Amino acid sequence: DPADCVDGDVNVRNYGQLSGLPSAKALFAEILGCKPEQVFVGGNASLQLMYDTIAKAYTNGLLHSEKPWCREEHIKWLCPAPGYDRHFKVTESFGFELITIPMTETGPNMDLVEQLVKDPAVKGMWNVPKYSNPDGIIYSDETIERIARLKPAAPDFLLMWDNAYCIHEFEGEFVPFPDILSLCEKYGNADMVFEFASTSKITLPGAGVACFACSEANMEYMEKLINVQIISYDKINQLDHVKNLKDKA
């Protein structure tokens, strides 16, 4: 039935709807605790969206960059460790000096982070806030608050917030997780964070749906860059996931 291929007024068999289907954006907004207009729904891999975000910062700069990162004399990146090797490989491939941040039972050593971000060459930090690889550490609320209220010297400092396990709870009842976007906005850092998630740990690894969430100002900026790269992602897969998952529950 052709009607099964329509989401609102969008025909999923056609081009268009760069930032994703309205229903898919609403689903991820519910999952992440943010607003649908802050969500960009892409293809099957959140890692690809992460790579693309760093790549665009490198070639074009971010919203508040004074120049593209490729024109900076030296760039550094904070890497809570032990952590996810594929994260580190992304920033390493762009020539960043990787700085190890020791992990504690409550997340990265924030005393060290707060000192290091005073260096304008430090452009960002990787984060897996829940069940961080490989130790399964969950960031405490205090750690997340301290991250959200950071005052980096670099105007384009970027939190890469990989919320891969955002709806998982391995022990006990589900505990709502702090929304990093609203926390950053609360502390005057609305444009400092890009949050990533996918259904890879929910439906099918390699055949799910991925997204990023960011401020509306960042979204407007990024859409202009992404529009050069792709007309639209796989909306049929997006709709398939919405119809099967239905909601966060």
List where the protein language model places each region.
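Conserved core of the PLP fold type I
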Residues: 4, 9-155, 166-187
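Hydrophobic "anchor" residues on beta-strands that sit immediately upstream
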Residues: 124, 158-159, 194
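Walker B catalytic acidic pair
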Residues: 162-163
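Conserved core segment of the aminotransferase class I/II
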Residues: 42, 182-249
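N-terminal basic, amphipathic alpha-helical segments
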Residues: 1-3, 227
